[in-house]
């Protein structure tokens, strides 16, 4: 699966443009611009599986650091503060990782 199988390349490019500078990543803005927030719950979970590098069923801080690169290989890494902020926004049960359900809830919040 390629991310452009489910999201428009133009929308992804626009979303990445908005957060190309360090410490400018805003999850909700990214989800809206990229089109993720308009997708069904099952489509968002498909994207989650694409982002989940080790297929563990969870995203940890190391995977989140490379979040933008899953949408475009040349994109920057998230800063430590952006990574921690993204984790805090989605990790509802406080276990230090984001499950598919938590990811979907964050995208649609």
Swiss-Prot record:
GO CC annotation, single: cytoplasm
Q: InterPro entries of this UniProt entry?
A: EF-hand-dom_pair, EF_Hand_1_Ca_BS, EF_hand_dom, Parvalbumin
What SMART domains has UniProt attached to this entry? EFh
Q: Name one GO molecular function term.
A: calcium ion binding
Q: Where does Ca(2+) 2 bind?
A: 91, 93, 95, 97, 102
Question: What range does the record give for the signal peptide?
Answer: none
List each copy of the EF-hand domain by range. Answer: 39-74, 78-109
Q: Which UniProt keywords apply?
A: Calcium, Metal-binding, Repeat
Binding positions for Ca(2+) 1? 52, 54, 56, 58, 63
As for family, the record states: Belongs to the parvalbumin family.
PANTHER family, per the entry: ONCOMODULIN-2-RELATED (PTHR11653:SF4), PARVALBUMIN ALPHA (PTHR11653)
Q: What is this protein called?
A: Oncomodulin-2
Recorded source organism is Homo sapiens
Name the lineage.
Eukaryota, Metazoa, Chordata, Craniata, Vertebrata
């Amino acid at each position: 699966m390629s991310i452009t199988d489910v999201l428009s390349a133009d929308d992804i490019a626009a979303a990445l443009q908005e957060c190309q500078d360090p410490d400018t990543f805003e999850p909700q803005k990214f989800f809206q611009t990229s089109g993720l927030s308009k997708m069904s719950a099952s489509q968002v979970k498909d994207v989650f599986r694409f982002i989940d590098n080790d297929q563990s069923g969870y995203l940890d801080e190391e995977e989140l650091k490379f979040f933008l690169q899953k949408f475009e290989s040349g994109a920057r890494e998230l800063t430590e503060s952006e990574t921690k902020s993204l984790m805090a926004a989605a990790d509802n049960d406080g276990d230090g990782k984001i499950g598919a359900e938590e990811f979907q809830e964050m995208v649609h919040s």
